[in-house]
Curated annotation (Swiss-Prot):
GO terms for biological process, alphabetical: rRNA processing
Region entry Disordered, spans: 214-234, 275-343
InterPro entries according to UniProt: KH_dom-like_a/b (IPR015946), RbfA (IPR000238), RbfA_dom_sf (IPR023799), RBFA_mitochondrial (IPR039212), Ribosome-bd_factorA_CS (IPR020053)
Basic and acidic residues bias (residue ranges): 325-343
UniProt-listed PANTHER family: RIBOSOME-BINDING FACTOR A, MITOCHONDRIAL-RELATED
Family: Belongs to the RbfA family.
Alphabetical keyword list: Mitochondrion, rRNA processing, Transit peptide
Biased segments, Polar residues type: 225-234
Main location: mitochondrion
Protein name: Putative ribosome-binding factor A, mitochondrial
Gene that this polypeptide is encoded by: RBFA
Presequence boundaries: 1-41
One GO cellular component, as annotated: mitochondrion
Compartments, record wording: Mitochondrion
Amino acid sequence: MWAAAGGLWRSRAGLRALFRSRDAALFPGCERGLHCSAVSCKNWLKKFASKTKKKVWYESPSLGSHSTYKPSKLEFLMRSTSKKTRKEDHARLRALNGLLYKALTDLLCTPEVSQELYDLNVELSKVSLTPDFSACRAYWKTTLSAEQNAHMEAVLQRSAAHMRHLLMSQQTLRNVPPIVFVQDKGNAALAELDQLLAVADFGPRDERDNFVQNDFRDPDAPQPCGTTEPTTSSSLCGIDHEALNKQIMEYKRRKDKGLGGLVWQGQVAELTTQMKKGRKRAKPRLEQDSSLKSYLSGEEVEDDLDLVGAPEYECYAPDTEELEAERGGGRTEDGHSCGASRE
């Protein structure tokens, strides 16, 4: 028995040597044969064996709605886009906003969408398209009641798809983006402010009238005992502004009473006469102090009056006979003498 087994083993070893020689003949330079393993397919097997569910973007009766991906409510429509727009895009957006505003307002004014929406009397403040035309924001005016605002918002969101379908059927735009109704916060703030002013307490009617009258009281009226006038100096650049303001107020009061015209005419006549007198007195005179201070104080006027009756001196060239007769007298360096002639 053992002899037979040893013979079989020897024959099997011979077969192995034969196969090796054959492989060496078929593949010269290759001492070993091809080797295959199932390890390379272990990743594929692991993927098929996993029990994770595939995410679908649609609802199916077999899968159910629980496996459908549900993004946050209006997240992709309300997010702000950072894409820069050109000047031409802004002009196009303004035109489309006006077109959509008119179309949506017409739909809200008719029961074509729904009778419930028509009964709510919703008013739109503006319509704004996003720069990438992914959504159409319609801002509607709110009311003072929070419950009514919530009901209106629910009805508007429910009717948004139907309104979009009507706009596309009317060919307002070729592709109308999804419509999103948003509460106008500015209008809500104004409504709240009006409500607060309506319930505000401004005091009795008489006190309010007195308050208004005190605001427009006469500036010359005596001040109450408890008040004090400002102690700051009203003089600037040598001008008393307080006195000047009093003169102006006095002139205004006289003008209102009908006396200002006469006073003004008298002042103008007085100024004209003074100017004429000044022109007559403007004659060549000797060198004297002609400063503004002396003129204003009246010193030059007195000098002019003294010079009116004084003799006038003039220079002339004497004859040769007079020069010989007056050789003994004083001469001027240039051969000219001065004489006085009284007119």
